[in-house]
C-alpha cells in the first residue's frame, strides 16, 4: 500500500475522523484509524465502537491496500508539516513510513482485519434535511442533554420523525428543549430514535452549516448521516424516551412577554449573587413588571426590575438561573414569551411570535 497527498487535502478528513477516537482505549486497535486505498481513493475510518466516522479523498501514486495507523500520532505529524507539503505514505511489513520534504517518520501499525467497522445498517427509513437546518435544531437543544445520568435514555437526543417534519428533543429531567422543522420530503412512517450524547457532539462538529443537504438514514440499531465525502454512523440508545409532550404545560394562562436581551442580561447580573450550588433566582410578577431577586448564604442580594407585557397581578416562582440563561441563549427572537400555570408549575419559554423552538424549565423551591 502506498499513496501521495497534499498536507491540506489530508488534514481536514483526518481531523474529522480522529475526533471520534478516544485517547484511552481497552483495545489497542481502537487507538488507530483504518487507512484503505482502493482505485485511487483514500478512506479513513475512526471508531470507539459507539460512533464511527468515515471520510474519503482522492490520492496520487496509489497502490491498493489497508492498514491501521495510530490516529493521534498521524494527525499530529500531518498538522505539524509545512503548508503545501507533499506527503508520501508507504507500507512496509508492520511499519508505515511517511516522507515530506526532508522529514521522515516511521509508525507502528496493526492489521486492518482487527479493526471493527459498521458496514451495513438495517435501513428502515431515510430523509433529506438541509445541513444548516439540522445543525440549527441540534444546537438549540443539545445543551439540555443529561450527562452520565443513570437514566441512560436521557444521555442523548431524541430525533422524532413524524408526518409534519422532524423534531429534536433533549432533557435532563430538570429542563427540556425542543426544536422542530417541516420536511419537504415526507417520511413513510413516524419514528423515534435516541442518539447518544457523543454522537450528537460529533455531528455538531461535522456540520459546517453550509447550503448542502444531509442524508439521514434511520436503522433499527443505528443512525447514519451522509454528507459529501463523510459518512457518520452511531449506535442508538436502546430505551424509551419520556413522553415529552406531556411535560409541555399547554394551556398555561399566566403569560409574560419580555425583551429577550434585557431579560438575559438582567439574569446574568442577578446570577452573580445567586447560591453557587443551587443557582436559584426568584421571579416576582406584579403590575406589568418582573422583579428578579437572588440571594446567597452570605445574605447578599441582587435585584433587577424589567417591564413586562402581562396581565398577571401577583406571582412569585423560583428557577435555576443557569437553565433560564441556556434557554434564552437558544432562542433567536427579539421578544420571548413565558407561560405558567401557577407558582408550582413548570415554565414554557419560547419566541413571542413563533413556537418552532420551545423550552420547559422546572421550578425551584426557594
Q: Where on the chain are the PLM-derived regions?
A:
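Structural preference for solvent-exposed beta-strand-turn elements
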Residues: 1-366
Amino acid at each position: 500500500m502506498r499513496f501521495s497527498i497534499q498536507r491540506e487535502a489530508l488534514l481536514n478528513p483526518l481531523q474529522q475522523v480522529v475526533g471520534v477516537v478516544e485517547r484511552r482505549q481497552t483495545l489497542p486497535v481502537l487507538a488507530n484509524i483504518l487507512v484503505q486505498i482502493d482505485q485511487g481513493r483514500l478512506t479513513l475510518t475512526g471508531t470507539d465502537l459507539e460512533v464511527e466516522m468515515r471520510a474519503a479523498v482522492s490520492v496520487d501514486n496509489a497502490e491498493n491496500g489497508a492498514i491501521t495507523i495510530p490516529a493521534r500520532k498521524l494527525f499530529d505529524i500531518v498538522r505539524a508539516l509545512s503548508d503545501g507539503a507533499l506527503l508520501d505514505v508507504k507500507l512496509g511489513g508492520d511499519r508505515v513510513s511517511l516522507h515530506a520534504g526532508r522529514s521522515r517518520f516511521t509508525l507502528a501499525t496493526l492489521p486492518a482485519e482487527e479493526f471493527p467497522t459498521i458496514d451495513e445498517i438495517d435501513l428502515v427509513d431515510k430523509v433529506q434535511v438541509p445541513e444548516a437546518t439540522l445543525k440549527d435544531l441540534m444546537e438549540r437543544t443539545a445543551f439540555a442533554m443529561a450527562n452520565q445520568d443513570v437514566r441512560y435514555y436521557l444521555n442523548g437526543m431524541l430525533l422524532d420523525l413524524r408526518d409534519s417534519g422532524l423534531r429534536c428533543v433533549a432533557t435532563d429531567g430538570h429542563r427540556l428543549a425542543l426544536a422542530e422543522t417541516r420536511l419537504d420530503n415526507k417520511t413513510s412512517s413516524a419514528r423515534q430514535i435516541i442518539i447518544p450524547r457523543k454522537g450528537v457532539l460529533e455531528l455538531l462538529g461535522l456540520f459546517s452549516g453550509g447550503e448542502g443537504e444531509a442524508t439521514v438514514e434511520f436503522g433499527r440499531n443505528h443512525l447514519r448521516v451522509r454528507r459529501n465525502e463523510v459518512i457518520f454512523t452511531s449506535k442508538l440508545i436502546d430505551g424509551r424516551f419520556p413522553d415529552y409532550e406531556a411535560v409541555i404545560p399547554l394551556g398555561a394562562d399566566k403569560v409574560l412577554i419580555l425583551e429577550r436581551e434585557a431579560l438575559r442580561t438582567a439574569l446574568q447580573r442577578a446570577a452573580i449573587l445567586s447560591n453557587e450550588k443551587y443557582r436559584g433566582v426568584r421571579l416576582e410578577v406584579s403590575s406589568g413588571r418582573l422583579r428578579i431577586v437572588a440571594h446567597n448564604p452570605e445574605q447578599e442580594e441582587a435585584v433587577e426590575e424589567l417591564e413586562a407585557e402581562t396581565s398577571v397581578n401577583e406571582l412569585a416562582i423560583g428557577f435555576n438561573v443557569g437553565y433560564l440563561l441556556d434557554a434564552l441563549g437558544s432562542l433567536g427572537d427579539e421578544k420571548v414569551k413565558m407561560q405558567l400555570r401557577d407558582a408550582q408549575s413548570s415554565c414554557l419559554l419560547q419566541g413571542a411570535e413563533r413556537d418552532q423552538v420551545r423550552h420547559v424549565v422546572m421550578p425551584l423551591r426557594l
